[in-house]
Amino acid sequence: MKIQTFIFNWRGQYQNTLNKEKQFKEIGIVPTVINSDESYPFEGDNWHCIGEESYFNAQFLKAIELFDGDILFHVQGDASYDNWKDLITDAKTYYEMANWGIYAPNVDYTWYDSSRTDVNTIDFPLDKLKMVANTDCTCWFIHKDVINWYKERKLDFSKYKMGWSWDIVLPALCYINQRPVLRDYNHTISHPRGTAYDTNKAEQEMWHLYNSLPSDLKEAFGLIKSNKEGLSRYYE
């Protein structure tokens, strides 16, 4: 099973990204860095500089373009953790056990905390793993099947900048196809509070994308946003 690791770097996160790159290399992984900080345009063949104007959406589209593995593992530049090896091992182990579509660790600061995302109407038998509506996109593993479903739908994210909807649309595809969306509370990623971008614009883009979706994705999208327990209908 090939896990392809991506780190997204942007202005102000250079040292954090280098630290993670070093951690990954110490366990035999050379991550691909999708970089939008033109102050550091090239740090090695594994760095892809896509321009200062690029935000999360362009970075994620670039990661999908470069992805040729079984699992896409994405980590934000401002996230930190001290045990990537065990997290990756658990991702593999639980894939073999549960055939998940998306697997992610807990994050210490995210809008999608347990109260907003745990789907309590779907029982999951493994300790500290929960079915969730949205894992958050700070650090997550996405199986290639989910990427392929996105491509087959011919969804057009290219017109957007912020990329808020990736962590809604991809879980929606998982629920429609009955592939678990899991958060592992055995691992917690450190993530700082606050954002450095226009959240109003991000929300406007999200709803613009929503209005362009086919009806089945709209339904799952709406449940993820406002009625997480309703997602259990996909498992009835």
Predicted features and spans:
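Hydrophobic targeting segments
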Residues: K2-I7, P31-V33
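Active-site nucleotide-sugar/metal-binding loop of Leloir-type enzymes
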Residues: L61-I71
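Short beta-strand-to-loop acidic/aromatic patch adjacent to the donor-nucleotide binding site
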Residues: D70-S80
